[in-house]
Amino acid sequence: MFAKAFRVKSNTAIKGSDRRKLRADVTAAFPALGTDQISELIPGKEELNVVKLYVHKGDSVTVYTSGGNPILFELEKNLYPTVYTLWAYPDILPTFITWPLVLEKLVGGADLMLPGVVVPPTGLPQVQQGDLCAIALVGNRAPVAIGVAAMSTAQMLASGLKGKGVSVLHTYQDHLWRSGDKSSPPAIAPLDPTDSCEEKVHLGLQGNLKSLTLDGEEENGQVPLREASEDTSSRAPSQDSLDGKPLQEQMDDLLLRCFLHALKSRVKKADLPLLTSTLLGSHMFSCCPEGQQLDIKKSSYKKLSKFLQHMQQEQIVQVKELSKGVESIVAVDWRHPRITSFVIPEPSLTSQTVQEVSREQPYLPPDIKSLYCVPANMTQLFLESGHKKGSTLEGSEVRKIITDYAKRNRLVDADNRNLVKLDPILCDCILEKNEQHLVTKLPWDCLLTRCLKNMQPAYQVTFPGQEPILKKGKLCPIDITLALKTYNKKVTVVRNLETYGLDPCSVAAILQQRCQASTIVSPAPGAKDSLQVQVQGNQIHHLGQLLLEEYRLPGKYIQGLEKAPKPGKK
């Protein structure tokens, strides 16, 4: 609901009577809150504001703010807590658990699909269809989203955990969260941690549970969790086994594991020399086991450069400063015992979850319209037709407005109806200063062309089943370029995938498999919050097949396809 910017209608301090009514409504809506907690949430004397706003879908929403943070919002006479409130009182709603990678999808406006739900040993929370519920991530009880259950718990289990689980209304990092102090979720330990004895029983029964899964039987949704435990144990020591180690030693082990995993499964000889920052950002982070987070500052090395110096001393890699202040890995000994003895883990449960979700939601190309915004100096021309500064119009609408304006003001030349006389308003809108006293008439096509040229470009992108997204400026096409790296090696670089609803990481994974070439996802230079995909070699032919044939994007939105290798040439 708040994935896109909203428009504030009013912001006023709450009245005393309204404050008392709100306290009563909160008591009725959230019976798990005690009297003291309600007094903390809605204090008697501290400032409390009521904000009326319109979300991008047009719904009217009332938001209650305290201390600069939104604490509650009301939609269709129903009260909902924000993530700020849930961080203070995490147990007032039934909570579903999901993987950290799913959060990005939720922030982008997606609902929580059941394949992405992690089932704890105690089973799913008991909800009925339409019940308010929260969503938290594995390892942290602090909710990151709220929504309403799309089906009851019984229906979820009966469906085999397929389909939509929670219709999401508000998330951490959405625009409602941004209206507050933008704090991050606190670390809240999960309730009822698994007993160590029980964990041993679980590990002993994993083989039986796996066979039960193959037979299609699940009881209380416990199998996926134990499969996850099995998967984690194959890649890294379990959390229970690590509890005896200091945190710094745990992070050292995790850092080495991610490093060896990246070298053995992701980095190829053709990638060298490889920036150390790229090794960390594009390879090591993605090799981190589920439920764990790689943080070099918590290791004994503190910095990546010190860790790589240690790896160089062990003669696993060779690091050089090829340009001032920028280190690169120039050589890797793939025969080193550390690398050869490392066992690559099985695909994680999360990657399977992402694949299931993507299968349920296949990519469909968006509908794209070119639009024009009314600038300040052309406001008078569009005022009579009910449009003001900033209004967006299609080209056909602009043509009709200009035509109607000329006819209504009798500006069509009587002797030559292909010409339009320019009145003061048209002169100010379309003529240059040196033309003001020289040009008195223009042909229709020239008049319309000049009007469109002087208006500000915009575009509207509409994905199937979603609200239109309106953006000002020119629509950037998907940009495919070839670049030469060290030793005259070619790489294919793709930018602007996000504009068309394409996930750069997903595209990189597909290209890596089809082209049998290494890929790197990195921040796009000069573009805020945008990523680029780099593929080893000239892979434009494969890209063209993927974008044009499978994703069915129109060719006019893709530039650089002509650089594909010609048939018969390598």
UniProtKB/Swiss-Prot annotation:
GO CC, alphabetical: cytoplasm; cytosol; nuclear body
UniProt function note: Translation initiation factor that is able to deliver tRNA to the P-site of the eukaryotic ribosome in a GTP-independent manner. The binding of Met-tRNA(I) occurs after the AUG codon finds its position in the P-site of 40S ribosomes, the situation that takes place during initiation complex formation on some specific RNAs. Its activity in tRNA binding with 40S subunits does not require the presence of the aminoacyl moiety. Possesses the unique ability to deliver non-Met (elongator) tRNAs into the P-site of the 40S subunit.
Originating gene: Eif2d
Pfam families registered for this protein in UniProt: Pre-PUA, SUI1, WH_eIF2D
Name assigned to this protein: Eukaryotic translation initiation factor 2D
Keyword rRNA-binding: no
Annotated positions of the N-acetylmethionine modification: M1
Record domain SUI1: where: 478-548
Annotated region (Disordered), positions in chain: 224-245
Domain SWIB/MDM2: 370-454
Coiled coil: none
Domain PUA: 93-173
Source organism: Mus musculus
Main location per the UniProt record: cytoplasm
